Amino acid sequence: MANSRNKSSNELAVHGAQQAIDQMKYEIASEFGVTLGPDTTARANGSVGGEITKRLVQMAEQQLGGGRSKSLS
């Protein structure tokens, strides 16, 4: 029997974080020269999404490690 408390994988774990994620998305898209929209290629959108993930992981590592993280580049 499925657990009705399971969250969708697309739901944010922190309520109110959507605005910060959206801001990060548009900042990264601008840095990469990507105009987000329906005509943007999956590859371009994926590069933005991948960079968001990379930066969020780096931020989490810094918090967990007391600010000591390696560069992901």
Curated annotation (Swiss-Prot):
Belongs to the alpha/beta-type SASP family. SASP are degraded in the first minutes of spore germination and provide amino acids for both new protein synthesis and metabolism. InterPro entries: SASP_alpha/beta-type, SASP_alpha/beta-type_CS, SASP_DNA-binding, SASP_sf_alpha/beta. This is Small, acid-soluble spore protein C5. The keyword Mitochondrion does not apply. SASP are bound to spore DNA. They are double-stranded DNA-binding proteins that cause DNA to change to an a-like conformation. They protect the DNA backbone from chemical and enzymatic cleavage and are thus involved in dormant spore's high resistance to UV light. GO terms for molecular function: double-stranded DNA binding. The record marks 27-28 as: Cleavage. The gene is SASP-C5. Keywords: DNA-binding, Sporulation. The keyword DNA-binding applies. GO terms for biological process: DNA topological change; sporulation resulting in formation of a cellular spore. It comes from the Bacteria.
